[in-house]
């Protein structure tokens, strides 16, 4: 899951070296904390949150493959 999210996010941002992921996995849940450079925050969130919504949808559906619930937190 980490590699999947990292690959997608790095394709969106200018400062790839500042993409940070922290993945906490329990028996039924995967929590992914995402941090990017301040300049790239708008690209990750998108207009009216559409990009963030799309990223969360991808993560949610990818986690369903393992019958888990996924939460993507975009932190500043």
Give a label for each model feature.
Residues 45-49:
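Glycine-centered tight-turn and secondary-structure capping sites
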Residues 1-43, 54-76:
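RNA-contacting regions in translation and RNA-metabolism proteins
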């Amino acid at each position: 899951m980490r590699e999947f999210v990292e690959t997608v996010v790095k394709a969106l941002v200018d400062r790839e070296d500042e993409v940070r992921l922290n993945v906490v996995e329990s028996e039924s849940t995967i929590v992914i904390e995402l941090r990017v450079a301040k300049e790239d925050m708008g690209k990750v969130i998108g207009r009216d949150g559409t990009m963030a919504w799309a990223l969360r949808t991808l993560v949610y559906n990818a986690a369903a493959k393992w019958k888990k619930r996924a939460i993507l937190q975009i932190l500043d």
